[in-house]
Amino acid sequence: MVYAVLTGDIVGSSRVEGKAHLELNTSLKRSFELVKDTYRDAHSLPSFDIFRGDSFQGVLDNAIYALEASLLIRAHLRKDQVADQQSDWDARIAIGIGEIDYLPDNVSEGDGPAYRSSGPVLDRLKKETKLEIQTPWQEINDELSTECALLDAVIAGWTPSQAEA
């Protein structure tokens, strides 16, 4: 079975303080619930964990939904951002596509090629890059890299109202 592992972190979370930080964390959790609700009817059971305060990892048992799930998370964060914050709420997300050798209840403890590609990809993302997909196939990775860069450019211009639409 081909899985998608989404590994991400909140962009600029250290600059979000007090009540706004709690609201940001709540928004992230609600975005995970949105993903779960969206794919429940597709017989897919997404699962997510938050760790280190602003990092997260999720698994989709059908990789076809990975890009859309990432967009749902990012759009939800941008929609919920607090107006007086100096930075937009957003997430950097690395998607690893592949097999999983071990999938426990706590998804951040899993292992396999999909896990081992998503973590290092997140670590390599540049400041302006917020989405990257890694598959076992280099030609597809090259194509997806270009498409993710274009998608990042579009998302960067979203207002909260546009993200909600």
Region locations from a protein language model:
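Regulatory and interdomain segments flanking nucleotide-handling catalytic cores
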Residues: 1-165
